[in-house]
Amino acid sequence: MIKQRTLKRIVQATGVGLHTGKKVTLTLRPAPANTGVIYRRTDLNPPVDFPADAKSVRDTMLCTCLVNEHDVRISTVEHLNAALAGLGIDNIVIEVNAPEIPIMDGSAAPFVYLLLDAGIDALNCAKKFVRIKETVRVEDGDKWAEFRPYNGFTLDFTIDFNHPAIDSSSQRYAMNFSADAFMRQISRARTFGFMRDIEYLQSRGLCLGGSFDCAIVVDDYRVLNEDGLRFEDEFVRHKMLDAIGDLFMCGHNIIGAFTAYKSGHALNNKLLQAVLAKQEAWEFVTFQDDAELPLAFKAPSTVLA
């Protein structure tokens, strides 16, 4: 059978919090089958757990948060969640000694390296996928996102940014998902923001960890980072990275075709909740062997040794 995945060993890293600008220690721990993805704040006494759950997601100006019933939150979970989706990690406990996951370089790549360093272990329990059975679409003004039935996982994302630094030909990106494709094509794409917004937020004591080290920063005319872009279409690739993380908030890889126009964290989450709320639109599936499994979810050689 196709088995659930966790880590082989505990790994730790440090980074900076986007909100506070302070050092954060991140610890990734293996977890037993059927645990799911658990985010844990160890700076609170007792520690507080936040299971990945579409209904717990709140989208703020700066990041995605998980919020519990007592209005306690953990922030900036989206890029790590994308890395978990990319590598198909089903069970993990993610600890931080702060209210937020460190921003690292603004992409998912540092988290991918950390997960690969931990090693990935197959558990003796069937991996459950969410398979889309009916088309589900959500809209917000001219923005929209939808899932259609498809035996695999494809993403097609279009942005519409009127900015001199973003060429009109680099505003759409489409891909057939796989762990290899995610690592090569998506994981290194960084978040982005306007210099004036960062300066304004920092003047109000917010976004204190925001810098050229963790984002693409633009003014009204150009990219300000000395090293420029990692991809010509890095902006739309990062929006796809965000979507991959947002859609994994149900804790399961999804079998279907995702298409979006000008979508963001809030609309991606609205789509996921709309799918899950419509019982006839999806089903849980497991697979006995690789021959049945959609190509999108075959484990690459770098993942399962």
Curated annotation (Swiss-Prot):
Keyword Cytoplasm assigned: no
Keywords assigned: Hydrolase, Lipid A biosynthesis, Lipid biosynthesis, Lipid metabolism, Metal-binding, Zinc
Job description of the protein: Catalyzes the hydrolysis of UDP-3-O-myristoyl-N-acetylglucosamine to form UDP-3-O-myristoylglucosamine and acetate, the committed step in lipid A biosynthesis.
Enzyme's top EC category: hydrolase
InterPro entries: Ribosomal_Su5_D2-typ_SF (IPR020568), UDP-acyl_GlcNac_deAcase (IPR004463), UDP-acyl_GlcNac_deAcase_C (IPR011334), UDP-acyl_N-AcGlcN_deAcase_N (IPR015870)
Pfam families in the cross-refs: LpxC
E.C. number: 3.5.1.108
Similarity comment: family membership: Belongs to the LpxC family.
Pathway as given in its UniProt record: Glycolipid biosynthesis; lipid IV(A) biosynthesis; lipid IV(A) from (3R)-3-hydroxytetradecanoyl-[acyl-carrier-protein] and UDP-N-acetyl-alpha-D-glucosamine: step 2/6
Cofactor field: Zn(2+)
Catalytic residue positions: 265 (proton donor)
Keyword field contains Nucleotide-binding: no
Domain of life: Bacteria
Protein name: UDP-3-O-acyl-N-acetylglucosamine deacetylase
Cellular component terms per the entry's GO annotation: membrane
GO biological process, one term: lipid A biosynthetic process
Positions bound to Zn(2+): 79, 238, 242
GO molecular function annotations of the record: metal ion binding; UDP-3-O-acyl-N-acetylglucosamine deacetylase activity
Gene: lpxC
Reaction catalyzed: a UDP-3-O-[(3R)-3-hydroxyacyl]-N-acetyl-alpha-D-glucosamine + H2O = a UDP-3-O-[(3R)-3-hydroxyacyl]-alpha-D-glucosamine + acetate
